[in-house]
């Protein structure tokens, strides 16, 4: 997507309001979405879910007796059986549930628990229905690493080549670029590498030397990479330019950056970055025309971090269409005819968007392909951003079509933002892909991926470390604590409103940020700080969030002063600390 820029930006954001009606009457001529719960039952289910979430199982049981429809009882019981503190489920409870509701989205979790509770010699519970769509939408990478071996075909020992690359990268990860250099200089290893593969790996070693602050060795390794293959040593040019800039050898930096910026075969993220830094070099030498030419190259890659910065520096608006596909009558009829679709529509009546989205994930595999765009639009309009993002990402991979309103979804209009909305959305997109039930290996939970210890500190409530940690999957609570944590970080003396530093602390931890600020020679330059951070995940995180911030501010019609400040080499706009 490299079309030029204009002032026009279309944004069509319509919300389908689901008003209650006796099942299954139509909502309205415009929506044509059937309801399967009466107003009384919708309200009762809403109360039941809330009571059970708080552990009030007996009070919820009294309300269950007043229901006319049992359409959502599978969800009610799964919430009860999976509650972490208020109920201990027996194998019989779980087995009976699976015999009735194995097509529900909680079936896999119930099955796992039933296997743990199964008495010796007892028959296993019924298996969950297959076909559930797992996963979240994936973010565009903001870094580059070559595939080695470049090809497995026609090679004498491709496995050996892969192992050499693995050993070199392991040495780099462990902080030993010189050890990596020893591996690649071993003649018995070199014979398994093509010239371009050697150039790629030597470029990675050069970048490692830059990361560890050894700029002279970084430049030397960069030159060795370029000598092996001038057309493929992308990381060599990149690392050589960064190391030369930090060493204040600006003419040499310009040579590295300009060469990479003019390589049409270079990866987008590196070409955009090199062009942006070539612009900075030219401005330092008082060459505005040359600077503009390189800024224009960077701006042709608006989905990269440096492309975003270039667009902002040039005062351009990237033309983005935020309209959604129309939802067809055929899709509405099909959805209402599916048992899972009926439950999803009922859950939308209740206002339980997370459970509704999970029901729809079971329908994706059996849905006619012609309805793919319908479901994307339906999920986007009905407050299911995680599902919308996941489906739009898959759709983009399959067809190349970018449905931006789903790739960059919004939250409910009822969401309470106390920090800049675009910033919060950008962080959520990067952290969890808008999936409220997301949980990392490190135990970070929910939309904003909060650690239990962080939540306990921010809320001043130790229960979030243990008995209340499951509550972090509640979107409202997670957003509240996450925004409070952002405000806390921005107020820290060593961050002092700096957006780049705040993002580094949010991802890498405040302690690591303190260490990086002490040890890194970043010369109070935001871009150099980003590139110098040792943790690749944190570098990519900052670049990703700032790129998404650009698109969300565009979508919301907000100004972008913080990005312009970054381009000018200043600190980020501190007005992001409060909602605008």
Which role does the model predict for each range below?
Residues 49-58, 85-91, 136-144, 172-184, ...:
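Helix-turn-helix repeat elements of alpha-solenoid scaffolds
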